[in-house]
Amino acid sequence: MKKMPGDASLPHGPVTFLVGKEEQRIEHVSKNLLCVRCEYYGKMFGIGMKERDAAEITVPKTDLASFTAFIDYLCTDQLDLGEGEGEQARRALVLRELAQMHQVPRLELLCAQALQESVTPATAVPLLEAAHTMGDGRLLAQCRRYVADHAVEVRASGGVEQLRDLGVAKGLLGDALDQVAELKMGAARTAAGRRAAP
């Protein structure tokens, strides 16, 4: 976005966000800064829009911690994914959705990178399902490969019990059957090589 602070077309004053079903508050966020950092808000608070003069904006379909991290990113250019592997992966997923919805491509890329780095035995299956739902082929392939290569650890972490999506379950079963077929073919080649050896 080419606008800069001081541009007369930018709105003045703060906005309060009412977040989630409980309408928890994030107060005193500069509309001007939001418009400069995010094209979505530039349009929302643009000339002729009813939100331009609104003191409060409701954001019902997210949680306070994730939306606070999103607003903090817009205001400071710093990404906070929280503490702990599971929380970081969950927050990265939610922030990525917020970045897509609000058209913030750099944040979307940072979240995609964080997701790729957060694949562990405990997160592989939930991330696999999320990648399937979002249509993220790269993360999907990475998670499938991880589950195949670390099956024992994923199973021990409870990853299999977390599986909810039948399509993903079918894909994992297909991967397992492919691995069994490869093992059998390898064993057959080894046996044939032994028989052919003098």
Model regions: which residues?
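Peripheral membrane interaction modules
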Residues: M1-D7
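Terminal low-complexity, poorly structured segments
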Residues: G6, V29, C75, C111, ...
